[in-house]
Amino acid sequence: YPAQAGQAARVTYRAAMTAEPPLPPVAFSVPGIAVENAKPAPGRYPLVVLSHGYGNVTAALSWLTENLASKGYVVAAIRHDDPDIADRAKFVGPLINRPRDIAFAAASLRKQLPDLIDPTRTALIGYSMGGYGGLTVAGAAIDPAGMLAKGVPGGELVTLARNPAALQVAGLKAVVAISPFGGNGLDIWGSDGLAGVSVPLLFIAGNRDKVVGYDKGAAGFFAATPRADRYLLTFREAGHSIGLNPAPAEMTSTLWDFDWFEDAVWRKRRINAINQHFITAFLARTLRGEAAMSAYLDVPVVNS
């Protein structure tokens, strides 16, 4: 959040991510520019709730969280309690919990910080599994007859699909979905569930994404959301790893660790800078009503 930090010491983020089995998780640190428990700057600000990918951590998204906070937003990055990605039997947990976590966090923060957050202006940003969660909360209807919904033990995903009101976020004005999960043959929203989304959308993806797909991922979702004012930013030849920080030094020893963070074609700092540019313009227009920001979104050429 915007703060009066002065010369106080800046934070260092510490986390760990899954290593290639059977190795233990790899711990790493990321230097930040935020100040822990700093006094908030006066005023009420739009809320941005950020949801990381399956097996990711919030520290790996500081390139975006701190950047947005410095531009006048209250940014809350959820630390999801994901199971080990190697345990495929527990994969269904995030499918159920991502939308619930996002809706719960947004509602709780508005109640806890009424003097800091403007409850009428909220945006969701999600990477990979977080993108699925954000789109679902925004109105994408899970198909109760779909393969994934029927395959979740106990029918919990079917129950979630039949109670969309439980996921609604008041004051929702925009969603940014980076490499969003949900398509690529899984079709969690069925043939027309995405048509329920009407808030402005910004999809960001690499067209060589082998994890969640592109034609049946972000590009397909873009085509399936006709009610929304929407944009699609594509990194040509990029894969799935376009949503995190540059790889910390501790995550460069093995290809598995490095692959969490880095793309095979694009420099990560270049990716982050481009994403910051478009996300900044998109949120300024949708959350602050700054019409002049459209000039940064409506680019003069499709391929550049």
Where are these regions (language model features)?
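Catalytic active-site module of serine/aspartate enzymes centered on a nucleophile-bearing elbow/loop
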Residues: 250-304
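Short amphipathic alpha-helix adjacent to the substrate-entry channel of hydrolases
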Residues: 33-45, 55-79
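The conserved beta1-alpha1 loop
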Residues: 46-53, 205-206
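Hydrolase active-site cap/lid region
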Residues: 124-127, 131-205, 211
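Alpha/beta-hydrolase active-site loop
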Residues: 60-63, 67, 90-120, 124, ...
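Active-site-adjacent alpha-helix of alpha/beta-hydrolase-fold enzymes
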Residues: 192-272
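Domain-level recognition of soluble alpha/beta enzyme cores
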Residues: 1-48, 215
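Short, solvent-exposed beta-strand-terminating loops
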Residues: 1-17, 132-145, 231-252
